[in-house]
Amino acid sequence: MFGGLSFRWYAEATDAEPENPALFCGWQRTFGTGCQTRTAKMSEKRGWHTLCSKERNRIPKHNRPDEPDRSLSKAPKKGQGLSRDGKRNEKKSDKMKNGKIGVTTENIFPVIKKFLYSDHEIFLRELISNAVDATQKLKTLSSIGEVKGELGDVSVRVAVDPAKKTLTVTDRGIGMTAEEVDKYINQIAFSGAEEFMAKYQNQAIIGHFGLGFYSSFMVADKVEIYTQSYKEGAKAVHWSCTGTPEFEMEELDERRDRGTTIVLHLSEDAQEYAEQSKIDDLLKKYCRFLPVPIVSGKVKEWKDGKYVDTDKDNVINNIEPLWTRKPTEITEEQYKEFYRELYPMSDDPLFYIHLNIDYPFHLTGILYFPKIRNNFEIQKNKIQLYSNQVFVTDQVEGIVPEYLTLLHGVIDSPDIPLNVSRSYLQSDSNVKKISSYITRKVADRLQELFTTMRADYEAKWDDLKIFIQYGILTDEKFAEKATDFMLWKNVDGKYFTPKEYAEMVKEQQTDKNKTLVLLYVDDPVEKHTFLEAAKAKGYDVLEMNGQLDNHYINW
């Protein structure tokens, strides 16, 4: 890539003599103690050829690109063999017994209450997700003619009653019959969403595990369900349970409005969930982009020295977030407005990347390169992961390559595997594919900006380089691409790719071993005397004062 040249770095102060005194004639006298050497070799295969020991030791041996896995497969033990597909077979003992593990139902609710979810507040996300599922199912059935008439208001409503210590979630979805309550509520881990998806494919249904409803027992001593199916002739059903395997269920003679109402009688240690402000905060955290309107109380206005309720519903969410739309329909200003919606106190981003892929996995989203005003503002965990517009987590290290956790934005994918609580990522081949896809999209976007908008790219380089340098140091695939759009800046404020710079200085700064010698300073003002001495000899000097520049010099 660089004509076989390797780079040798020289700082302005050192204890070592340069290898080629002829090239640096007079340099030692001018610079006091001479020049320190630091090497960073380049090769055709990839940008930075060797890791410094500090960086190298942070990478497991089996992941190092230049060190193949030398582990040997263990030989089969006695009693083992290999099947035709190469897999090891265990020889079964005549005393082996097959059976089923017994589960004591009396013990399952304490487990659910304490350990099912990492955060108890997630119960609200689960209940709202179920309500949205029911509404989306109703819309699907209506679109194919299985539901007659107008659907009316399909908002999901959340209400608190501090006096009664209750929290109520109501939807106007498909509702349930007594048989369906028995099937989907009385049998833990049987998900109605799974069955519905099998029948009506290609519909955005959130639920997967059938345990979401039972998360309500983490905060409630008693839970009641009132439900009315959309089906003609179906009776309303009332169901209640106090957190034991015993429940009560009855059909009601009086028909109710279509849909389901869930009433949580909050336990003494969960009274905070009867506060409107607490619920609003949780809804904004988990449900701000759900595809069905979520109503929580009334819009407030300032009147007579205090806030009072108006008659207008307080809709928490944006049902059509920007990432669900086609990029061709979105303006630059709309991308910036969405960024401000996500991060109200931040400066406008440098640029964005719109993700949209349907095969071999489903993934949409928008990633932003934030403008970092100073070195103390670098923060991770600013990318939000959603599944069908339901917030899951902002801990995305398993999906997004480590260096891209510095970015901001949103990723939405129903194909990212989650455990039963949806709070932690599971190992899966799709995750690796998604990570590779995101890396490629980021590299392609940077290359596009560099090629088509070079001047603008250079103007933003001081803000961009922290992301690109971190990527080169931590991601080999990204490093292979990044050398084409990575820049070096000299003390005159001019920018060059490594290849461009090597071509410019090779005549003046190549030693007898055909090694290209690069000079740098970390503070041009403080090292002004040294700079003038270097320039007097016809040398060009780079400015290396970024947070990660030392890592490059040590490579």
Protein language model features and the residues they cover:
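Serine residues within intrinsically disordered or low-complexity segments
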Residues: S6, S43, S53, P68-S73, ...
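Intrinsic-disorder-associated, low-complexity terminal segments enriched in Asp/Asn/His/Tyr and depleted
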Residues: D15, N20, H49, N57, ...
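GHKL (Bergerat-fold) ATPase N-terminal catalytic module, capturing the glycine-rich phosphate-binding loop
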Residues: P76-G81, G86-Y273, D281
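GHKL/Bergerat-fold ATPase module in large chromosome/replication-associated machines
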Residues: I205, V223-E246, S267-Q271, S277-W555
